[in-house]
Amino acid sequence: MEEQDFTAGIFLIDKPVGITSFGVVSRVRRILGMKKVGHAGTLDPFATGLLVVCAGRPATKMISSFMDGEKEYIATLCLGVETETQDPEGAEIARKQVGFLHAETIETCLAGFKGTQMQVPPAYSALKHQGKPLYYYARKGIEVKKDAREITVHEIERLGEGDLEGDHPSLVIRVRCSKGSYIRTLGSDIGKVLGCGAHLTDLRRTKSGFFNVEDALTDVDMLAEDAHERFMKKVLSVESVGKLLQ
């Protein structure tokens, strides 16, 4: 696509660790020289992977449709350690030696999380309560009642095999789930069922709907001198993506 012809499109970004989803959007705005840019589904700063970014009004109008799609993640759990945010960014609140876990015990636990279920959103999340995100209240120590929401875990599997042993071994899982699913909370709940507690140390989104992170622009592309040219080579047109949504 010629640069002067660009008015709207969809970009797949592989978000690097340590930057917010809004930070990625800000970068894209600067690269494209456009203000009307948004993303379809927040990734926490510690997380990496696929962020669907829409530029131009025809594209941003499609954001809700993209957010409705299924998501796929690869998550690494640290067993035996719990944090207040269920991820590596929060303070440690509990620690327990894991010791030994049979492979069969792990598989049975994961199988129990497959299907439709009710999930209570984490206190440290962007969900709104009286106009403010839940993390606003959590940081002030204000407890807010969080209603459980229905989610569906379509697939969940362990990546790796064998028994786990040691003080705080890692468990790596792949999850394909519905919109609104919190993998941090899923990881914490898995730790509870295993009897040792857990928090996420790594989270990577690999798929969002029919989009795959393998096709995404990288941090190198965003920081390159010819970033605009690289983006134009990888832009997905509103028309082509619209056909996929039909």
UniProtKB/Swiss-Prot annotation:
One GO biological-process annotation of the entry reads: mRNA pseudouridine synthesis
EC number, as in UniProt:
5.4.99.25
The top EC class is: isomerase
- Keyword Mitochondrion present in the record's keywords: the answer is no
One GO term in the molecular function aspect is:
RNA binding
Q: Which InterPro entries match?
A: PsdUridine_synth_cat_dom_sf, PsdUridine_synth_N, tRNA_psdUridine_synth_TruB, TruB_C
Q: What catalytic activity does the UniProt entry give for this protein?
A: uridine(55) in tRNA = pseudouridine(55) in tRNA
> Is Cytoplasm one of the keywords?
no
UniProt keywords (A-Z) are:
Isomerase, tRNA processing
In this protein, the active site sits at: 44
NCBIfam families, A to Z: TruB
- What is the role of the protein in this entry? Responsible for synthesis of pseudouridine from uracil-55 in the psi GC loop of transfer RNAs.
Protein family per UniProt: Belongs to the pseudouridine synthase TruB family. Type 1 subfamily.
The protein in question is named: tRNA pseudouridine synthase B
What species is this protein from?
Answer: Desulfotalea psychrophila (strain LSv54 / DSM 12343)
Q: Which gene encodes it?
A: truB
